[in-house]
Amino acid sequence: MIEWKIFVLIFLTFHMKKLLAQEIPLDDSPKMFDDQYKGCRDKMDKVVPGILKSEMQSNKEFKDSWEKASQSWKLIKPTMKLPKNFQNEHGIAVIAYTGNIYEAFNKATRDVGASSKNYKNKYRFKAMHYYLTMAVDLLGNKKRSTLVYRGVKSIHFVPSNSSGRVIRFGQFTSSSEDIKVAKNFGTASFFKMQTRYGANIMKFSKYPNEKEVLIPGYELFKVQLFKKQTHEFTLVSTGKTKNLFNCAYFKALLDK
């Protein structure tokens, strides 16, 4: 009986280590919803208020998060210097993301995969994604790079051999200007990055001490250095973007 328990313990330990050591490749074409809305932003501005209303009615978690963020936005907006064309909904979307909704939002964004049908029929954050994309685009300073860090627990990322050591995250990705803050989130994989498209959202955040910079999933990075033993990356923005989807909402209307 003791020998059997020892065998089971060894077996479980071995497989747990394999699971924890699982490596996930990063490349330049992750299958996630990553629309930049190029060429259709004016059209989206007209239809997205209706989309937002519908999604709030059908998604209580999102409704509660959006309404709470809306109240916070009313308080902090007068204290902020905002870029031209920055709408209330942009600010609300950023605040909502820094709250508790980001987990459900990111999971839904990943679950779309590369499927237009999934986006059309299952994605419940169409309005949130649009407003957040516009907010990050307006808040970002593309003329200069910002040094940020990102720590991840439980996942070992590696650069894919198929993408020429150029990668992107595919979804909105949080990072920090403070290396200590980033390491508090994990060190299973660790990123040191120079971002050109990331937006400093510290003043919007529920946790301003985290000095958060939000990186859009479409930004391309060159892997300058990767340490396999520690899964540490040094990434430099290429200054370019790439996305699988564009103007997906209007293309979905044409699909039957």
What are the residue ranges of the model-derived segments?
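ADP-ribosyltransferase catalytic core
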Residues: 163-245
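Short N-terminal segments immediately surrounding and downstream of signal-peptide cleavage
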Residues: 22-43
